[in-house]
Curated annotation (Swiss-Prot):
It comes from Nematostella vectensis. It is found in: Secreted; Nematocyst. Residues 53-249 form the Peptidase M12A domain. Keywords: Disulfide bond, Hydrolase, Metal-binding, Metalloprotease, Nematocyst, Protease, Secreted, Signal, Toxin, Zinc. GO terms for cellular component: extracellular region; nematocyst. One of its GO terms (biological process) is proteolysis. GO terms for molecular function: metalloendopeptidase activity; toxin activity; zinc ion binding. Pfam families: Astacin. This is Nematocyst expressed protein 6.
Amino acid sequence: MKGFIFAGVLVSALICLAEGKPFDNLELVEDDMLMTKEQKEAYLAHQNGRVRRAALRDRYLWPQGKIPYTFSDDIDQAGRELAERAMNHWMSRTCLRFSPRRREHAYIEFQYDGRCRARVGYTGEARQKVSIGSALDPCPLGSVIHELGHGIGFFHEHSRPDRDEYVNINVNNMREGAESNFRKDNGYFVDSRGQDYDYGSIMHYSKYQGNNAFNAVVMEPIQRGAEIGQRDGLSAGDIRQTNLMYKCNAQGDSELQPVNDEDEDKDGGDSKKKPDPKGPKPGEIEE
């Protein structure tokens, strides 16, 4: 389930987070990405391109790799420890730094809503929810690591514009309504930083995700012997991509600075492309 946020369309999705109703007016995209209607339309508008790796542009990344966080009132001690283990997994392997929120305006909030899902990328407004299941049925650690991947700016790996060179999708084996989980970006939002497709990414779906029958294969790797869908931890590619994305230096700090719209227009991206209304986009909620 991997795909970095490309940085071009998140603004509208930021407005939707009501203080007491965290997912009001948000639509679920690809099972675990939450987006506003406008963000969903923009995301869906960029699915047929050629950029590699599903990673967002700088505008949708957390400045300096610093991510404040809080816990909702319903999160128990076990849930807090689960979230902390997932954050430590990222921090021990990248230059990202999660810290308890003080007065920061933008932050993530861990909560129980019964699902494993999160907003994609940095929106810059209000709190961004990361749901880690429920007290009775918490998400596995690997799934929480995966959801934090969405939160820091990854789409699903199979959302990459070049994914058809690496996996075959069998729509006949999909359950009804699962098609939207297998959309790909057209290169408008995605910036791969020159990295190759990563079968081993923690952001990649398994072969059976979204299937309509037991053991029915929905997504088959083209490379013989390749395994997809692991939830053990970050792959070497995940780590490398994150450190490139957040401009990690030799001291283990992020040199990523805030990017405004004007700077973003000058900083990479394909100006000839337009968002694909049917493609994934920043600010959506993904699982």
